[in-house]
Amino acid sequence: MKFDSTEKIDFYLPKVQSFINEVVMPVELDILKQDIPVDKRWEPHPEIEDLKKEARDRGLWNLFLPDSDYGAGLTNYEYAHLAEAMGRTHFASEAMNCSAPDTGNMEVLVRYGSKEQQDQWLKPLLNGEIRSAFGMTEPQVASSDATNMEATAELVDGQWVINGEKWWTSGAGDPRCKIIIFMCVTNPENERHQRHSMILIPMDTPGVEVKRMMHCLLYTSPSPRDDVIS
């Protein structure tokens, strides 16, 4: 397969590579060496926040979004070249506001969010003012098959009543996390691939609880996951 360059690849890729080599890599080892307790590893790190400021100053922000109204207007093919470069380091994607779960959540809000939802959640995510989480995996079922989800949402007197537990929920432990996109069953009588919905749940909603931080990779993962009950 032949991988041809494009004008946008030629413009952005050298800038991304320079940012990584000149700014990110020199501080990465120092950040990784810091003995941060596992339950504190989602908290904002001052050196990473400095990287974000530099990335914005260099025009390297929200590069993942193909919609030019919000991002750089790159195709998936063009962005893949930048993502490959970002993959050299733990922190480059976060520094450029291109890290999961925020990227996928922003894409959902761009495609399907109402104007009100975009104003409330998408804009602050694009600005790096808040973080988000995505709730899919559940303790009791093989969650790689989304049709197994057991969490439910039922409309009662005009309000959604949501019951369920998610774990390995990336992002939920970050104190800046203000919204979770929560996958749940809303139409249990439908065909099994048409039973589910994604519901936006503000993290300060009564009944939402981050139960515990999940441990993985001998406690060395720089980004632990969480067990969330709704």
Residue locations for each model-derived region?
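A short, Trp-centered hydrophobic/proline-enriched beta-strand micro-motif
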Residues: 129-136
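Single conserved hydrophobic/aromatic residue that forms the stacking wall/gate
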Residues: 219-230
